[in-house]
Regions:
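Structural signature of multi-pass alpha-helical membrane transport proteins
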Residues: 2-12, 16-18, 22-83, 93-101, ...
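Helix-coil boundary and interhelical linker segments in multi-pass alpha-helical membrane proteins
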Residues: 44, 100-109, 193-203, 222-232, ...
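Structural signature of hydrophobic alpha-helical transmembrane segments
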Residues: 49-64, 82-86, 106-119, 143-146, ...
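Cytoplasmic-side transmembrane-helix entry/capping segments in multi-pass membrane proteins
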Residues: 77-90, 111-115, 135-146, 169-177, ...
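Helix-loop-helix hairpins and the membrane-proximal interhelical loops
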Residues: 90-136, 159-175, 179, 324
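Transmembrane alpha-helices that form the ion-translocation and gating core
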Residues: 112-146, 185-197, 314-315, 321-350
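Alpha-helical membrane segments and immediately flanking helix-loop junctions
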Residues: 136-184, 202-226
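Oxyanion-binding "anion nests"
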Residues: 221-263
Length: 350
């Protein structure tokens, strides 16, 4: 009979990580309570840190906590649930933030720019990763995070390419690079836009098409001048978020073609991708009251932040120290690539 999968805690002990459907409710409560509690605190603190989302803050807390304070063995089953089930539920609810009507207001030209940014960004980053010598899995996570929507895209891609969490260090490394490069872009994009004579909505379009995290786009849009610039920046960013669905679907099909290590075929399209698209349609064609949308946004952030914390607890800093300079070089090149494609597209259609 095959042995159950295990999870190594920071204390060096190993505890079983059952499948999400296996543990009884009482056994998952400690880990879920810990993850959700940290998520709530992250949501309260994140607004005080411009450009840093609750998701990023939660994963940092998870890494630090797991490597400084021995986590109780009782938390392992709940953390396993949080890193899988809560992650997928949060991505589904992310679809409620995207309204097709808002995206249509950008015009076909700008929507094509968004497709080009995501497509060229991902394919180009994968090629750059080969040239620089970064492992394929980490390269794919960087490509998705930098081209689509930051930490959420990294986690979604990891859920498709690493369903057993065997390479959690790659996930945390990619998120850390999103924070580093995206934070620099909060300053660089408004400054570069001013130097090039781009103002108002044009600068906002570039910010939304080039910066990694939604929170970072909001910070940059405010620095550009707020108002219309901030509005279009966020709408363009949400158009990139919508690209999460087709990209994850393509990645799922690639995984299916290559097959899993245990011989089992992964699903043709991950269920959370279908759920994400369903929520986009609900937001676009059903009159949802503002309190419902606000509640959905809060719940989505809560679930994703809890999942990020859980992912962070599985990471050992000693392994992160072995990353080396190559991923940083790839992140810089990917940022330049995405920003350049975005700028060229905006100048063509603006």
């Amino acid at each position: 009979m095959p042995s159950a999968p295990s999870r190594t805690l920071s204390s060096g002990t190993v505890s079983p990580v059952p499948s999400p459907s296996m543990p009884p409710a009482p056994s998952i409560l400690p880990g879920l309570a810990l993850a959700l509690g940290v998520a709530v605190v992250s949501m309260l603190v994140a607004p005080l840190l411009p450009g840093i989302s609750a998701l990023v803050l939660a994963i940092v807390v998870g890494v630090v906590l797991a490597n400084v304070v021995p986590l109780p063995r009782a938390a392992a089953p709940g953390l396993a649930i949080a890193s899988k089930k809560l992650l997928r539920a949060g991505i589904v609810l992310l679809g409620l933030q995207v309204a097709l009507g808002d995206l249509a207001s950008l015009g076909i030209g700008m929507l094509l720019v968004v497709v080009a940014v995501v497509g060229v960004g991902i394919l180009g980053t994968v090629q750059l990763g080969r040239l620089v010598g970064v492992g394929r899995h980490l390269t794919v996570l960087i490509a998705c995070g930098f081209s689509i929507c930051g930490a959420a895209a990294v986690a979604a891609a990891a859920g498709v390419t690493d369903p057993d969490d065997e390479r959690e260090e790659d996930t945390v490394t990619a998120v850390a690079l999103v924070v580093l490069c995206g934070s620099l872009m909060i300053v660089l994009v408004p400054a570069a836009a001013a130097l090039m004579g781009l103002h108002g909505e044009t600068a906002g379009l570039w910010a939304g098409a080039s910066i990694h995290e939604v929170a970072q786009v909001v910070a940059a849009g405010g620095a550009i001048g707020g108002g219309a610039a901030l509005t279009v920046a966020v709408i363009v960013k949400l158009a990139r978020v919508l690209m999460l669905a087709p990209v994850m679907a393509v990645m799922s099909m690639q995984q299916r073609r290559h097959g899993a290590k245990d011989g089992k075929q992964p699903p043709l399209v991950q269920l959370f991708v279908v759920g994400f698209l369903a929520m986009v349609l609900v937001r676009s064609f059903m009159p949802l009251p503002e309190p419902v949308l606000e509640a959905g946004s809060l719940l989505q952030t809560l679930l994703l932040a809890a999942a990020m914390f859980a992912l962070g607890t599985g990471v050992r800093i000693s392994l992160l120290k072995q990353v080396g300079p190559r991923p940083f070089l790839l992140a810089a090149l990917s940022t330049v690539l995405v920003a350049s494609v975005a700028l060229g597209g905006v100048l063509l259609v603006a």
